[in-house]
Amino acid sequence: MNRIETAFKNTKPFIGYLTGGDGGFDYSVACAHALLRGGVDILEIGFPFSDPVADGPIIQKAHTRALKEKTDSTTILEIAKALRQTSDIPLVLFSYYNPLLQKGPQYLHQLKAAGFDAVLTVDLPIPRNANESESFFQALMEAKLFPILLVTPSTQEERLLQISKLAKGFLYYVSHKGTTGIRSKLSDDFSTQIARLRRYFQIPIVAGFGIANRASAIAALEHADGFVVGSAFVEKLEKKISPEELTTFAQSIDPRQ
C-alpha cells in the first residue's frame, strides 16, 4: 500500500506545502520537519519554476527565492532524502509540467528512489489527444508514483470522467477560482461541489487553495477528506520565522488537535 493510501486510513489528513529550497536547503529541511511536528500528515514539496502561473504572489515569490538559492532538480531529491532519514511521511512533488518533461522519465524513478510517493503536476494536460501527457502518465505508473490530479469548480463532466480514470491517492479540489493564496473563507458552494465530485470519484477528496486558519480547516473537513495549507506557511517562511514558530503556527491551524 502506498504511504498516501495509509495516511487516509484513520484520519482526515492535514496536508502542508513548502516550496523546495525556499530559504536554502538547510532551512527548507528544517521547516519541513517543523510542519511534521506541527501535525502535518502529508507534505507537498514544490519544484521551483521560473513561470509559476497557477500560483499567487506569495508562492510566486517563494519560487523566486528558491531559484536564487540555486535550487534545482537534484536539490529536490536531496530534500526528500534528508526527510527520509527520520520520517516516513508521504511526500508529494508539486510541480509544473515543463520541468518534469525536460528531465524525462528517468527523473521520475529518481524521485521514487529519493522517497517521493506521488507527483502533482499543476498544469498537466489530461490525455485526450495529448500524446506527451499520455506517456507521462505511463512513466509515473512505471516509477510507481501516484498521479495527484486537480479539479476546479468549473471542471465539466466529461473532464471529470477522464480524470476519475487517472487520479490515484487523492483528488485535489481547488476550492476557489484563480491562483493559490490566502482567503478568509471557503466558497459558498463548497459542500455542493464536494457532493458533485463524489459522484465521479471513489478516492479521497481534499480541499486546497485558500485554507489558512483553523476556521476554514474546520469548514473544509465537514465535507472533504482532508485539507491543504500552502500559502499561509510560505508567507511565514518569507518572514524567516524559526522552525519552532512554524510548528506552533501549524498546530494553531489543525482543528484535530
Curated annotation (Swiss-Prot):
InterPro entries: Aldolase_TIM, RibuloseP-bd_barrel, Trp_synthase_alpha_AS, Trp_synthase_suA. It catalyses: (1S,2R)-1-C-(indol-3-yl)glycerol 3-phosphate + L-serine = D-glyceraldehyde 3-phosphate + L-tryptophan + H2O. It comes from the Bacteria. Keywords: Amino-acid biosynthesis, Aromatic amino acid biosynthesis, Lyase, Tryptophan biosynthesis. Gene3D superfamilies: Aldolase class I (3.20.20.70). Belongs to the TrpA family. This is Tryptophan synthase alpha chain.
